[in-house]
Amino acid sequence: MTKKRHLFTSESVTEGHPDKICDQISDSILDAILSKDANARVACETTVTTGLVLVAGEITTSTYVDIPKIVRETIQGIGYTRAKYGFDAETCAVLTSIDEQSADIAMGVDQALEAREGQMTDAEIEAIGAGDQGLMFGFACNETQELMPLPISLAHKLARRLTEVRKDDTLSYLRPDGKTQVTVEYDENGKPVRVDTIVISTQHHPDVTWEEIDRDLKEHVIKAVVPAELMDGETKFFINPTGRFVIGGPQGDAGLTGRKIIVDTYGGYARHGGGAFSGKDATKVDRSAAYAARYVAKNIVAAGLADKAEVQLAYAIGVAQPVSISVDTFGTGKVSEDVLVELVRNNFDLRPAGIIKMLDLRRPIYKQTAAYGHFGRTDVDLSWERTDKAAALKEQAGL
C-alpha cells in the first residue's frame, strides 16, 4: 500500500509553565539530596497554584536539605520574581509533607545496594530488584542530528528560545509562561520535508500589543530557530491566537509534577509507558529504564542498524532482569528485530543496578533535564545520549 504525505505535530512548554515549575522543583530537591547522599531514595511530587507550593512524597536519606529554600530559589531562577506576575518566589507559601519510603517497596530494592554499583559482583547486581513493575519505551530516528523526531526537536528549540529572549531582555515584555507547537509535513517515504504550522503562546506584559508580539516572535524566535528551507509561503503561524495572555503561570493554571510526560520524551511520535521522570531517583525504573531504553535505541540508529528504533523494557517489582525486551524498527531495520534484541541483551546491562552503573545515575544531574526535554539534548552532557556502543553493535551485526 502506498504511503501518503501526512502531518505530525508535537508541543513543548517553557520552564515557566505551571507543570514544568513543578518538575524543576522536584528535580532541584532530588539534586540537592543526591549531592550530599548519593544513595538517597527520593520520590518527590510538587503542586503549585496561586501563591502556594506543596511538596509531598517519600524521601529516605541520611542528609538534610532546606526544601523551602530550594523551592524559592528554583522559582526565582525561572523568573517569577514579582507579585504582578501572579506568582512570587519570595512571598508564595511553601508547604511540605514528606514521609520515608515504604518498607515493603524498599525490601525489593535494598539488598546490597549501598553506594557500591562500581564494585558490585554480577551476583550482587542480580540481587537488586526493580523498585516497581512497569513498562518503558526509548526511541531514536535519523530525522535530526540528535537522532530525535523533528517536530519535538523544533518545539523544544522554540520554547528554549522564548526563555532566552525573555531572560536576556531582547523581549523584556515577555513573562515566564509559554507553549510552542510545531506541525511537520512528511513525504511518501516518511521523511520530513517542511514545517506546516507553528503555534506559540507566551505570557506577556499587559501593555504590549499583539502586533508587537507577532512581529517580534517571528523575527527573534522563529527565524532564529527554524531553518528557512523548512518554511515556505504556505507555512502557517499562530502567535498568541487568543490575542492576550497576561494571566499565566500558577495563577492561570495549577501545576503538577509529571504532567508533561510527552513533552519530556518524544512529542507523541513514539509510545510511552506512562511513568513520569522528575523527582525520582535512579532506583525508580520509570526514570532509569526509560533513559536506558533511549540509550539503546540511539545506539542502534547511530550504528546504522535502523533508520528508527523503538525499544520497550518491562520490569516486575523486586526482580532484576527485565521481564521483556522488545525492539521495533518500523520496517527500517538492516537486520532482523530478533538479532537486534540479542545484540541489546549482549551489550547493555538492563538490570536496575546495571543501568545505574552503566549510565552513572547517582549524580545531581536531573534539574537540567526538567525543562526542554530529557532526550536529544545538545546543550548538556547526558550519559544516555552518548553513542559509545554504536561501533560494537555495528561490528557484531556484521555490517
Swiss-Prot record:
Keyword terms, alphabetized: ATP-binding, Cytoplasm, Magnesium, Metal-binding, Nucleotide-binding, One-carbon metabolism, Potassium, Transferase
Residues the entry annotates as binding Mg(2+): 19
Protein location: Cytoplasm
Record-listed ATP binding positions: 17, 177-179, 244-245, 253, 259-260, 276, 280
Ligand binding (K(+)): 45
Stretches the record annotates as Flexible loop: 101-111
Subunit: Homotetramer; dimer of dimers.
Protein name listed in UniProt: S-adenosylmethionine synthase
Gene expressing this chain: metK
